């Protein structure tokens, strides 16, 4: 028998879900980086966005064309990119992809239509054309001269330069950029730290504005001292592209996602990119909804 108590009990989760700000918004994660275990961190992050914030998330992962299995060593096959055609937001974590034109078209059409993007770490060098140089999309390659600096520099704000912090020896402490302490993306964000090393950034393009600066630490612990020989450089910034909001961070090591402050910044960035900054909670909920024990970083060859 359905009682008032059981009816109210069944309504509580439904009402809570209805109140989640992201309800009705579709986020597509485009993933494939070979080194930083994005195939593990992005699914966990997507589940968190769905459970705590109501966004509907779709994952597009690199798949072995023979087996159909997720394979981070694959850099030429992202099945399911047509989901971008009706997406509200693209979250990308890519590195050195050279996709078939039919797949690449969905990514470029999305960006060139002026639609919001959130990008992580190696996405500054998302594409690397070495085989199909006649492709109309080869101009988006990270060392492109025709479209100077390719997708990374033109769309996101910078391409790959080099490591600034020593890789796997110097970690990163996040410091709000001057004047950005009250920016919505940093709402409730404290104590950002991660084992990712700071990338070298020369000049951010267009209307880019740093949000978070990276302090190079002389060690791999949150308590490691700063390296006094290395200045602070941007590790997260905002800009526009074709009228759309773009957020980019060069953080994204799987260990970075163990940090509440970093996860909260990423959640807030999704809200901001969608023009929903008024909906960003004072302290966004960022608890993982699945166990998060990422594998060590390192390159994985195609299976």
Predicted regions and their residues:
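C-terminal segment of N-terminal export signals and the immediately downstream linker at the start
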Residues: 1, 18-28
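Helical hinge/lid and interdomain linker segments adjacent to catalytic or ligand-binding clefts
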Residues: 28-29, 34-126
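Catalytic beta-strand/loop cores that center a nucleophilic Ser/Cys/Thr
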Residues: 50, 56, 74-75, 86, ...
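A glycine-rich, often tryptophan-bearing local segment used as a flexible ligand/cofactor-contacting loop or short
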Residues: 92, 97-187
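Short, well-ordered beta-to-alpha junction loops that form the rim of enzyme active sites
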Residues: 122-123, 214-215, 250-252
């Amino acid at each position: 028998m359905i009682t008032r108590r059981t009816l109210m009990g069944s309504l509580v989760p439904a009402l809570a879900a209805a109140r989640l700000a992201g309800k009705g918004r579709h986020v597509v994660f485009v993933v494939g980086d070979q080194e930083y275990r994005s195939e593990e961190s992005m699914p966990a992050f997507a589940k968190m966005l769905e459970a705590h914030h109501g966004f509907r998330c779709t994952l597009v992962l690199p798949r072995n064309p023979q087996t159909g299995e997720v394979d981070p060593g694959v850099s030429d096959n992202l099945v399911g990119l047509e989901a971008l055609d009706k997406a509200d937001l693209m979250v990308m974590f890519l590195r050195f992809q050279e996709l078939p034109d039919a797949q690449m078209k969905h990514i470029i059409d999305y960006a060139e239509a002026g639609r919001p993007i959130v990008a992580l770490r190696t996405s500054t060098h998302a594409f690397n054309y070495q085989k199909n140089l006649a492709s109309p999309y080869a101009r988006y390659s990270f060392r492109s001269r025709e479209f100077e600096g390719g997708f990374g520099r033109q769309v996101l704000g910078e391409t790959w330069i080099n490591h600034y912090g020593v890789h796997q020896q110097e970690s990163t402490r996040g410091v709000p950029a001057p004047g950005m302490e009250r920016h919505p993306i940093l709402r409730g964000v404290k104590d950002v730290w991660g084992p990712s090393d700071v990338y070298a950034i020369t000049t951010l393009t267009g209307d880019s504005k740093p949000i978070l600066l990276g302090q190079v630490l002389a060690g791999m612990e949150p308590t490691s001292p700063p390296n006094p020989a290395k200045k602070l450089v941007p590790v997260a910034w905002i800009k526009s592209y074709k009228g759309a909001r773009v957020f980019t961070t060069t953080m994204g090591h799987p260990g970075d996602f163990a940090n509440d402050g970093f996860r909260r910044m990423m959640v807030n960035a999704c809200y901001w990119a969608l023009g929903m900054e008024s909906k960003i909670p004072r302290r966004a909920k960022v608890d993982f909804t699945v166990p998060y024990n990422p594998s060590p970083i390192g390159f994985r060859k195609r299976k």
